[in-house]
Amino acid sequence: MSVETYKFDAEVGKVLHLVIHTLYTNKKIFLRELISNASDACDKLRYLSQSNAELLQGESDFKITVSMDKEKRYIILQDNGIGMNKEDLTQNLGTIASSGTQKFLEQLGNDAKKDNMLIGQFGVGFYSSYMVADEVKVISKKAGEAQAYQWSSKGEGEYYIEDCEADFIRGTKITLHIKPEYDNYLDHFQIKDIIKTYSDHISVPIYYVGVDGKEQQVNSSSALWTRSKSDITDEQYEEFYRNIAYAIDKPWVTIHNKSEGVIEFTNLLFIPSSKTFDLFHPDRKSRVKLYIKKVFITDENVALIPKYMRFLRGVVDSEDLSLNISRETLQHSPLIDKIQASITKRVITELEKQKTKDQGEYETFWNNFGAVLKEGLCEGTADVDKLLKICLFRSALQDKFISLDEYIANLKSEQKNIYYITGDDLEALKSSPQIEGLLSRNIDVLLLTDDVDKFWVMVTRKYNDYVLKSVTSANIEIDNCDTKTAKSSDTNNDGKDDTSSSDDQNCEQLIKYFKEVLGDKVKSVEVSKKLTRSPVCLTVPEGSMDIRTERFLIEQKQLSSHSSKILEINPNHTIIKKINENIKLNQNLDVNKQLVMTLLDQSYLIEGQPIPDLQDYCNRINFFIEKSVN
């Protein structure tokens, strides 16, 4: 039979140009697409042979082979699947966006659709060959038919079909003539790596045929996540984890589930037992891989998990996900949101279970990934309360990790707030003047030292109807709490319990003096309810930004300047008493002024806020040192 020439269907030139130059950003996926098509062909025949065994013609073991001829610049892929006749070649390869797999699915009943393992849903995967090849030849022989046909094209608007002889009983053989600029694909290491990366879990075995004719199976041809959990050992899970995550540690938790309903998908996810070095790198890729029917699609630009769970490793495999025409970039699909919501719920449930099961191990997890998980508190999602429930925080009173539920269980009568303080150093927070009065009344304070803590506390204000309140707020309601009497110790350390407070007149006079000396350097001066050992501290008005958060945002260039603060004073402290005494006696007023200015600068230092005039501060310190020496 002579060669017959055909024109591709309408607009084919534009579509081919799109496929070759625009549609696929990753050239190496041409082999993934061809292998997926070959796998489909094998699955089609496997299904049809159930009702017509003669189609197998005595060859029931399916396989895919890949070989190359470097000298002739050929890459050859062959399968022993269903094959195609002349009509199939015209329909499937002569028409862009017409997929034989899609048509096959349309012909199946609903029950049969659930059982088949066909991958291709679009008619352009085959044409990705032209990204790296300047000519493609296809020899195919359909199962149950005697005649073989050759289809060939350079991808320039025409294709050719002719009768031919085939040296195989059925299936399809594709030969790509590789363009000179893509010589890198004429390397058996490269070819094997592509197969291993994208098609490792396809059920049909894939063999690389060397120049000596020997076949070497490249893929594992087994997807662990498709098996029942009861059939998988811990060792098999560990081996899979190390392979999929490129990790050397053991997984701390394995989450293996199959979802059915609105969307069907399987997840096999792992929580590592150690933290990776790039966990907080802004360009870090997701380590959860998306598969469709056991074919690797991507681990980029797909929100299968929320960013605050980026410590997860593993795979998600679905047959329902909608891809755009290239299979490269996922469409904006509500199915992705459903998968993410389902996975998020499972992970939170699993973490809650682990927290109850072994607090010690959970604390190890928290030290590794707690800061990442708390990023979810910044997003204002419906999962905030669930996330807060599994969070751990360092307790100032108990000097250990506790949950918010544990904090609430130990609340004092009439206490309505959950108190916290943010900062960079745990030991510095423990000795902060801000928490003295609370601790002296046995009211606990949560010590928050992660950078993310400075952000989530601004958007997450409540937990179980209790207000999360910064201790740097001026309005700390601790007087009505049913607790032990607060102890105020001065710097004399004489062992005496000095709890007497100055009368109203003395306090008014003292505050007036501080305001006169400090002027607009502070927003206000107030008598403190929370200081017991320290003379002064800085606070902010109710509703204002936390002092430490403000400092962090200024360091990150998100704010330009510090806001005006309130200076709280402790009338029972020795220094404040001395200042008050000098005021009453109208003596040492110059020293008094120096003391007030120095106390303000000290409060700046404690909160990490820069001193406005460092040289003036040093001069004052030297002045007091000289007086002490003399």
UniProtKB/Swiss-Prot annotation:
Official protein name in the record: Chaperone protein HtpG
Sequence segments annotated as region (B): 328-551
Location in the cell: Cytoplasm
Keyword list, A-Z: ATP-binding, Chaperone, Cytoplasm, Nucleotide-binding, Stress response
Chain segments carrying region A: 1-327
Similarity remark: Belongs to the heat shock protein 90 family.
Residue stretches of biased makeup (Basic and acidic residues): 483-499
Keyword Cytoplasm: yes
SUPFAM superfamilies referenced in this protein's UniProt entry, alphabetically: ATPase domain of HSP90 chaperone/DNA topoisomerase II/histidine kinase, HSP90 C-terminal domain, Ribosomal protein S5 domain 2-like
CDD domains named among the record's database cross-references: HATPase_Hsp90-like
Region (Disordered): 483-504
Species the sequence originates in: Orientia tsutsugamushi (strain Boryong)
